[in-house]
From Swiss-Prot:
Lineage: Bacteria, Pseudomonadati, Chlorobiota, Chlorobiia, Chlorobiales
HAMAP family xrefs: Arg_succ_lyase (MF_00006)
Pathway connected to this protein: Amino-acid biosynthesis; L-arginine biosynthesis; L-arginine from L-ornithine and carbamoyl phosphate: step 3/3
PANTHER family: ARGININOSUCCINATE LYASE
Single biological process term from Gene Ontology: arginine biosynthetic process via ornithine
Keywords: Amino-acid biosynthesis, Arginine biosynthesis, Cytoplasm, Lyase
Keyword Cytoplasm set for record: yes
Organism: Chlorobium limicola (strain DSM 245 / NBRC 103803 / 6330)
A GO CC annotation given for this chain: cytosol
Protein name, per record: Argininosuccinate lyase
Length: 463
């Protein structure tokens, strides 16, 4: 096992007559955070060195030495045999110093035509690309679970809510597909973001380019980027792709948090619509009867962390003059935490959802004679040519009567209905059934069972 430290001179120290203060170095060191980028750093350096050799800036022999050394260092870091120390300042220094130990002075050629500015920007984009793809895959897995649930519960009737008040009976499948579409847009955002992320900044150097005959397009090709930077200042001095990634993650977490809130409410005794498997619930250390939806609550809580990271990044960048500033080093903690938190939240939420069951018998009883069928009365009258505003007014009076008399809407006699409007006939009772209400929906994308079946087929094609 190798423990790195700064017994050697820091990469930038030759211009200074005094050693860097140890407390200042400890304060500015980022290696404990950016060590997570070691794979991307080695990948970027390998491409850069390959390009340098192809352009004749270093020899093929030197390139081979450096690349072999980088591979060995990568294996050491992967296995935990090379342990970065805070005195090494950052992971880039760790790798270069270890390379020098392995191959000598040739290691110094790795940085020809390159600054840590474009090096870090490249590492960050490679990291973002990987995390975007990982998150996209996790979201796709969650969508598959949603499709499965929608298929299972396509004809299960639940309440649709507005203002957290029972509104209209709907298909449970329709509910699950609503979240499918929200996560579909989140995946679309990630796909669109990838177009901006997958542009190489390597070759911009510090910010003004280099006098060496670099070939940034070749470096980009080796790293599987779609293109190369247009402006060297812009390439190293913005973190808008980091901000955009965290913004997309914030929306993903917002959707998860809303979904989690429903599961928490529905699994409560007061609602009793849904059962969470014991494998995904916790109890109380004091109250033996408790069964808590902790996983859903944690997802809801972690949403705040991701929102906080977005504000952190916007605040870091808001007043920075061009081009690079050391403030930008602080982008790593919010970026890494956001990626890890969001991907883990999506993955665990999918597993949680798989282990939930709707209480169909209870839902059937609750939806059978509820006031949520009032809209059906209004639309019944509209079909009889009564203007909707008048139909709404009549229905409101019927609802008041139902509440005051303690009679359900299907329990009101025809004679009483006709005191509110002579348009009522015996066929009103056919409309006052949740299943009939759902089947009667005719509009595109509605909650009717047939519409949900169409939506399901579309969802499967998208997956």
């Amino acid at each position: 096992m190798f423990f790195m430290s700064n017994k050697k001179e820091l990469l930038w120290q030759s211009r200074f007559s005094e050693p860097f203060d140890r407390d200042a170095l400890r304060f500015s060191s980022s290696v404990h955070v950016d060590k997570a980028l070691f794979r991307e750093d080695i990948e970027g350096s390998t491409a850069h060195v390959t390009m340098l050799a192809e352009e004749g800036i270093i020899s093929e022999e030197e390139s081979g030495q450096i690349i072999r050394g980088l591979r060995e260092i990568g294996a050491e870091l992967e296995a935990g045999d090379l342990v970065p120390h805070w005195e090494d300042e950052d992971i880039h220094t760790v790798i270069e110093n270890r390379l020098k130990e392995k191959i000598g002075a040739t290691a110094g050629k790795i940085h020809s035509g390159r600054s840590r500015n474009d090096q870090v920007a490249t590492d960050t984009r490679l990291y973002l690309r990987r995390q975007i793809r990982t998150l996209g895959t996790a979201l796709q897995g969650l969508q598959k679970t949603l499709v499965s649930k929608a298929e299972t519960y396509r004809e299960t009737i639940i309440f649709g809510y507005t203002h957290l008040q029972r509104a209209q009976p709907i298909s449970a499948g329709h509910y699950y597909l609503a979240y499918f579409n929200m996560f579909r847009r989140d995946r679309d955002r990630l796909t669109d973001l990838l177009k901006r992320v997958n542009i190489s900044p390597l070759g911009a150097a510090a910010f003004a380019g280099s006098t060496l005959p670099l070939n940034p397009a070749r470096s980009a090709e080796l790293l599987d980027f779609d293109g190369v930077f247009s402006n060297s200042i812009d390439a190293v001095s913005d973190r808008d792709t980091v901000i955009e990634f965290i913004s997309v993650c914030s929306m993903v977490m917002m959707h998860l948090s809303r979904f989690a809130e429903d599961l928490i409410l529905w699994s409560s005794y007061e609602f009793g619509y849904l059962e969470i498997s014991d494998a995904f619930a916790t109890g109380s250390s004091l109250m033996p009867q408790k069964k808590n939806a902790d996983i859903a609550e944690l997802v809801r809580g972690k949403t705040g962390r991701v929102y906080g990271s977005l504000i952190t990044m916007l605040t870091i960048m808001k007043g920075l003059p061009l081009s690079y500033n050391r403030d930008m080093q602080e982008d790593k903690p919010p970026l890494f935490d956001t990626a890890e938190t969001t991907i883990e939240s999506v993955s665990i939420f999918g597993k949680l959802l798989e282990h939930t069951t709707l209480k169909e018998e209870r839902l059937a009883k609750l939806t059978a004679d509820d006031l949520s069928l009032a809209t059906e009365i209004a639309e019944y009258l509209v079909k009889k040519q009564l203007p909707f505003r008048d139909a709404h007014r009549v229905t409101g009076r019927i609802v008041s009567h139902s509440l005051m008399s303690g009679t359900t809407l299907p329990g009101i006699t025809l004679d009483v209905y006709r005191t509110f409007s002579e348009l009522f006939e015996s066929d009103i009772y056919a409309a006052l059934k949740p299943e009939a209400s759902i089947k009667a929906k005719k509009t595109h994308g509605s909650c009717s069972f047939d519409s949900v079946a169409i939506q399901l087929e579309e969802a499967k094609k998208l997956l």
